Amino acid sequence: MAALPEQAGAAGTPGPYVFAEGTETVEGATSNVEGHRLSPGRSYKSTLPRAGQRFYRLELDARESAYVSVTAIPKPGTQVSYADGVEVSVQDADGGNCTPLEAEEARFGSSESPRPITATASRRVGPDEKSCAEAGTYYVVVERTRTSRSAREPQDSRESQDSQGSQGSQGYGSSEASPEDWDLEIHVASEPVLKAGDEAEGEKEPPQSWDSSTPVPPTGERRPREGGTSFSSARGLEGGVWGAEIESGQTLFYRVPVDWGQRLSATAELGSSSVDGSGGSAERGGAVRRGTARGSGYVSSALVMSLYNPVRAQVDDAHTAYDGRQKSAALEPLPPIAYENRFAPADEVATMRFAGWYYLAVHLSSGVAEKFGDGPLELTLRVDVEGDPKPGPAYAGSPRPADEFRVTERDAAAARRGETAAAGGGAGGGRDEVMAVVAAGGIGAGVVLLGILGVWTLVARRRAAAAVATEAVATEAAVAGATGVAPGAVAEHTERAEHTERFGPPRRW
């Protein structure tokens, strides 16, 4: 029997990217004919070299859409440029792409800070889908972004660009791409077609109107909740005001259950820096921070918050610069979850097509430590889920993973307790697998396994309770008094939710 799942993401500093327990390690092939088969409902670990394509294989029927997300995970300290990133496509036997775009991409953008980034491609079925609609073999193709100058330009060309300098960041392609392989997490999900006669089956248009006004962020006491380091270790959140410490270079993952008919909003706030005005050190919450005077530094795209839907397709991102004073970044207004949203031309609407767990990934640029010291900063998340749940579409089959596109009472409880998927609070949790074994193993084996399940449940609950208790007694660092803005300090500037620059080209779902 597999080991009992760990309660990842307890209070404390998150470690490296955490892959889900039982994740199979596979090697990407250099040819499509050798591609390892990927199955819907499962996650895989792989690697991606600096150059070259890697192939994987899907066997799909004609009654399910498939969504393949690829999360690229550079090692901490890796040099990345604006255009560096990962791209993924699903192709048929003739090399044709199954999505309107040539490939789906995710890039590091102007933050130029290494972190997990995710791109998602799909093969869709339905009355209006003409390509890749037949049952058969399809291929997943993954590579680093071909438009990345740091990966494809000759060295002398890069040096010529570097000599010209840049403003605000390292510049487009100004740093040489790391030669190391990147880790990959590949997640495959499937969505069945609708039952004949389902009301949503005849819908071909997105909702004509919805409240697009900017939601009012929730207020109230800030409750501590440390984030996870990956999709599988993302900590559950319900609506409210949540706080954590975030260090330069870290990415914190959270997940929020959003049901059909409900609307999600989120704002991330970064607290002020408390380094002293002499470039020395200052105490902050019992720790010593070292850096330059508050207001004398400036980091473009210092805080990046990305929202992903249940199949890990990016919905929206928001980012803000940082000059030592408190800043915030908010997602654009999003529509209520509806099956018909998939027919909308705007990605921010089209990706809000599923009920289930939505993921928030919050990253603090590695450049912040250079300007404002190496200690953590205070992060505040204001999350709200508006509206009453509505009945979802009637699928002609079961999604994979199971319960992927709905919100259960167990999900709501997991969000309240801050549980991760490994603790049994999400689709694909280990408890469902044990129950399947009990059902298939007969009475004798079932009694033994139910006893183990009881111990498992008790341990998971105690771990979750311990994590919450630890958070509850955690003291929040007092923000030091302002030392005054140095002469000539940069004026307040925020790049929040303006979308003058996205972290990757426009996607089309």
Please provide the spans of the model-predicted regions.
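Hydrophobic single-pass membrane-targeting/anchoring helices
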Residues: 417-472, 501, 506
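Cytoplasmic C-terminal tails of single-pass
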Residues: 462-509
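Extended, solvent-exposed segments with strong compositional bias
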Residues: 104-126, 232-235, 241, 321-352
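Membrane-proximal extracellular "stem/stalk" segments
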Residues: 253-434
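Non-catalytic extracellular/lumenal accessory regions of secreted precursors
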Residues: 8-54, 76, 98-112, 151-156, ...
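Extracellular and analogous surface-interaction loops
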Residues: 48-50, 54-66, 127-134, 244-248, ...
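Noncatalytic modules at the cell exterior or secretory-pathway interfaces
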Residues: 64-66, 124-152, 262-264, 349-367
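Edge beta-strands of jelly-roll/beta-sandwich modules across compartments, strongly enriched
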Residues: 148-153, 171-188, 355-356, 367-385
